[in-house]
């Protein structure tokens, strides 16, 4: 009988990161997927990154994950979103060639040390004494294991809707999983339904691009991965069009035929990625909605019209598309659809992503109520790391709100839960100025090195980068000019007769890296504008970062105050019954987590701290 230490079920974005992370830690790992050729499949939009999402990708890369490196092998349109705003909200994004992305992912995983891939379908999980024993395949065979990571995406009782038509599926042409849904229900997990959707796909050869707006990418693509020196993939343009009043009329006239508005769908859809039906209803005063025409590949004429996700009948979809400028004669290759699926209340898992009910069972991705490739991948890498560390009897790996967007996401999910698909935003992070895309490796790579999940190659690159940062920082502190010379150059500085270093100049409004290079041409020789940009940001926002660090220190002190597992909140007399019940249900692990539970008052937190000091003064936490 086959036996593995860790088995990952599902080969989507969460699954591939989970499997690779577990394998990197030297643990024999098996990835079970319905179609190995679809590893890392982009089921919806052909793009990676975006605002906040791009930071997640950089954080995954910092821990030696796959997503950033793979998109650099397949990215055909790179664009830094929000670049005209502050660096805390910059969002690196890349349009992908779907085929190249899957090909690169497949090549990496099929040659990954300590990782095997099995074509198959898991029907059940064998559990004894609330511990994982094995997975059972649909052919009746059993594979023994210590840990299981469920990354089922939209496959748990998945149901596609196109108008009144219902198709049982995890995605187009792939069977759903009913067995695992039943298993989770029998265990006692709280399941609910969510919904997501995708737009119709259209033939780019039939688009009149003269009626659209050109959207070029960045002149020089900025790679996602620290392992990528330069993006060698050919770059192409995207285009923008918009809906019209006629489009909106057709949608309104047919709302009763939409699966979303006929009452056919139970699941709640993503608030921040609404269907075109939702947009017309919720924003009824808007006369138009933008549509981004995104190519799906270099040698693929399929276009993804981002912005018109729909569950309307096929004939209605054809009608509404014809009313969009440039798409009057377009050929529809595949209709859009909505899909609903089961998910588990994420308050059923801990911050390690292990379930509270079953030891050794981890959940990652859409099964936890999230939406998006990047959110799934971020959970996958943490679940994979922790499953492997548990096999090795090592301490768990936990990111926090203070050091990563991944930590923010996991804390939000495990503390508050979600009743709609959870998407990452910069606004969710209190410390977003410190948690930028450009410093992800400086925040997380050393943490990954400490637990052994980072390769030797990445270690060398990271060590060299840290050395270069110190060298360039020293140079920027050495290069200087008098205030009088700077004034002659048109740079507004106080005429106090002092010398101003480059780091001083970076603090001046509207002064940037390009100006510094113009004044001090030797900075060109550093040949690393990424480091110059990093140091520019750190200098420009130094005072804000210092204040934010004080907030982070306070947060970390509360996170370090652990709450014993066996604490009885009903024995703390100064706390109301309502709060006692909430704390007992949530089981917070630290004072910081307890403070973030809705309805927990500052007075209650003080009472807990006093109780812990008197009851557990010996440091006991059992």
Curated annotation (Swiss-Prot):
GO terms for cellular component: cytosol. FAD binds at residues 10-15, 122, 177, 366. Its main location: cytoplasm. NAD(+) binds at residues 269-283. Keywords: Cytoplasm, FAD, Flavoprotein, NAD, tRNA processing. One of its GO terms (biological process) is tRNA wobble uridine modification. One of its GO terms (molecular function) is flavin adenine dinucleotide binding. HAMAP family: MnmG_GidA (MF_00129). Homodimer. Heterotetramer of two MnmE and two MnmG subunits. Belongs to the MnmG family. NAD-binding protein involved in the addition of a carboxymethylaminomethyl (cmnm) group at the wobble position (U34) of certain tRNAs, forming tRNA-cmnm(5)s(2)U34. This is tRNA uridine 5-carboxymethylaminomethyl modification enzyme MnmG. The gene is mnmG.
